[in-house]
Amino acid sequence: MQITRLNIERVRNLKAVALSGLQPFNIFYGANGSGKTSILEAVHLLATGRSFRTHMPKHYIQQNAQDAIIFAQSLSEKIGMQKLLSGEQLIKVNGDTVATQGQLAKLLPLQHLDPQSTDIIDHGAKPRRQLLDWLMFHVEPEFYFAWQYYSRALKQRNMLLKTKRQLSLAELEPWNKMLSEYGEMLHSQRLVTVERWKDFFQQDLAQLLPDLQIELEYSPGFHSEVGLWQDLLNYHNKDVERRYTEYGPHRADLRLKTALGDADDVLSRGQKKLLMMALKLSQIAMLHASNKETVVLLDDLTAELDSNAQRRLIERLSQLGSQVFITTLDHQAVTQHLDGLSISYQLYNVDHGQVHAV
């Protein structure tokens, strides 16, 4: 979905924002605190139902307001969200109310590229698992269904483990069966997807870090050689003792291996940032190969990447057909790259919450 029109109301310090004629690349510049990042935050809210800055709606909904509204339109779709202080939300697609955020997310695949962040590499398995599941959601039609059933079974099993200190295998058997069935399904889907992803990853890695060999390895979160059912039986007593489910796809990881060891241990901060870019760009490329285009949020592009890296990133995103929303303090550096690559763009000045096309 390529956004042609964007309306934002009551998000942080932004005045009512009404943008039309959006281009493949849209650059928002202005002083720190002017509201640039809040525009990206609003688009992120619309696509995912979450802010990338806070979990608390009261922090991004304007003071004394009860809600925030974000609306976007493409040539063929109209999507909108009303987010309430309570965290509840109302979602509409082409005027019809829809039940789940997933329906909206399917229409608006979105990646947030933060050049200052190395969380995917440094902060344990969870952000890497979330990265993998973003890809799964968009390329594997049955993933969301399997994940929903697996998550419900896991929640029920963990509740039992927490409420009873003594549990027999028979008491857990219904949940073990459900976990095993849908967990193995998730594992099979992830295994196939990661194998496909590896080729895309190596292509983007070669462009951004040509002197490094890094392998992407999938760890399923359980002993796949014996199967999840057997793990649940073998570790029954330990699960009862710990009062949670130790093994399963909810503990999966993506391991990034170099010849010298794990990437988080041996790479410099600059290399980690480029590795993070390669991971996300390769996912965007994989969607592009399936005729799905990704909206990309690029916050503070010029702050952490040198000029060559900026140009390579912009060129690659253009090749992948992405619509890109960029914030920067140095718009001249960004427009110089875009002009040099003959890429269409629109420039916006953001000043004290007011957004004006330049």
Curated annotation (Swiss-Prot):
Entry-linked SUPFAM superfamilies: P-loop containing nucleoside triphosphate hydrolases
Top-level taxon: Bacteria
GO CC terms of this entry: cytoplasm
Positions of ATP binding: G30, A31, N32, G33, S34, G35, K36, T37
A GO MF term: single-stranded DNA binding
InterPro entries linked: DNA-binding_RecF, P-loop_NTPase, RecF/RecN/SMC_N, RecF_2
UniProt keyword Lipoprotein present: no
One Pfam short name: SMC_N
Transmembrane helix as UniProt keyword: no
Keywords: ATP-binding, Cytoplasm, DNA damage, DNA repair, DNA replication, DNA-binding, Nucleotide-binding, SOS response
Membership in a protein family: Belongs to the RecF family.
Role: The RecF protein is involved in DNA metabolism; it is required for DNA replication and normal SOS inducibility. RecF binds preferentially to single-stranded, linear DNA. It also seems to bind ATP.
UniProt name for this protein: DNA replication and repair protein RecF
